[in-house]
């Protein structure tokens, strides 16, 4: 155990990285999970808050992903799976609004590339100085695209001042532009980008040094190559040593990297081995040293009715706590509950760090009072799909949220009805999804998103 932190030390100990000065961002980003972002009849999504604006608060542009809700061949909603990172859902684009207001003009940033073709977009992040936006794109995709075949996921960057869009890694100089997949980019304070990738640069270099054939390690399910964390320069190069950038080593996926105020990288790791199958939070220095479990290895039985949940999409809030999404792997309509984790004092929900041994927990609390269920079926409080803490001193969170609705199949044609207690007691209530994107105040756990404008799916 790490004596200072009371965490499990999983790597070579080094001097902890100091937090570089982080510039105030002039741009805030919301990555709206596409499957939960409802489109209106006109194809638009409302991002708004009906509360009066605070004259002391500066409003910033927002970027978000918008796509159609994916359907199976039988017309039912297709369920995502946290363990599958390579699959794509066509019909997505990256959009910009000058403010989080229904009157703000919506601009399609990626239309210059997608041009109506079948592309997918995800994992949006902004640079610390608020001048650039980075995200993952895949396309153009065939109607019955084999996820194992190219085109693959690539990382793109949008420069706001010049209104230019480009692939961060130049395909012409990429040694393997067709089969490797790069997702989940996040800016480091020095301008470099940490991302999840199937490149496995150092792993394959070790195989080469040992005289063994180079191959991409598959995850334990053998469904797709393992995604691990690597770091590249701002221009998409990897420096003189092409094997240096690999930050993490895992037999399954490392995803959703972000940077803490102390300069360390925090991410969600899929630990999958005999007798173990969970996604917990890990951290390390930006060079991969001093790897440690950050939170949650023994806190997965904290879902609805003490069911299993995974911890994904961690982001640090201005007060130092961690905002994360807890949800099951699949069959939960692409969403779950937002929780706030006190990672500064706890390593598990009821286990404090060594320096805080008198604390009893809980370490994690719901971000809102919504009655959100993390099990399959209707959720009275709706479900959250993604969240972005606004670093503007207002303690707000921009979220992608789907309201609880039911499909009454006793009517002809079937009708959408509210999730009332009576309707929920009906035999086999069927959820119908509706999404809202809005800013929520968590000062007193009273979500302002209840008054947001909503768009029907």
Task: Place the predicted regions along the sequence by residue.
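Multi-bladed beta-propeller domains
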Residues: 45-46, 101-119, 159-179, 232-252, ...
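Loop/turn-rich, solvent-exposed surfaces of beta-rich toroidal or solenoidal domains
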Residues: 268, 312-443
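Short coil/turn segments that connect the beta-strands within blades of beta-propeller domains
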Residues: 59-60, 129-131, 190-192, 262-264, ...
